Swiss-Prot record:
PANTHER family: HTH-TYPE TRANSCRIPTIONAL REGULATOR, HTH-TYPE TRANSCRIPTIONAL REGULATOR SUTR
Domain HTH cro/C1-type positions: 11-65
Species name: Sinorhizobium fredii (strain NBRC 101917 / NGR234)
Protein name per the record: Uncharacterized HTH-type transcriptional regulator y4dJ
UniProt keyword list: DNA-binding, Plasmid, Transcription, Transcription regulation
Record GO cellular component, one term: cytosol
Organism domain of life: Bacteria
Family matches, as Pfam families: HTH_3
PROSITE patterns per UniProt: HTH_CROC1
InterPro entries: Bact_TransReg_Diox (IPR050807), Cro/C1-type_HTH (IPR001387), Lambda_DNA-bd_dom_sf (IPR010982)
Transcription regulation recorded as keyword: yes
Amino acid sequence: MDMRKLVGSNFARLRREKGLTQEEVEARSGFSQQYLSSLERGRRNPTVITLYELAQALGVSHVELVTPTDETPFGTR
């Protein structure tokens, strides 16, 4: 399982479910839009602290960012 792709996919899905843009998450979290875009594409390897802060910005549990779902794209498991 590629954790970077899993986290990116989950982050993008949760962000969309909350109706937030990357710019809105940037304002809530302090992480740049460029960082968030790279994260969603699976190009970042966030620390545990970063996962926690991003989850807070989305209003979800940090566990939701690292848990595979039925919506996880094939190849990330």
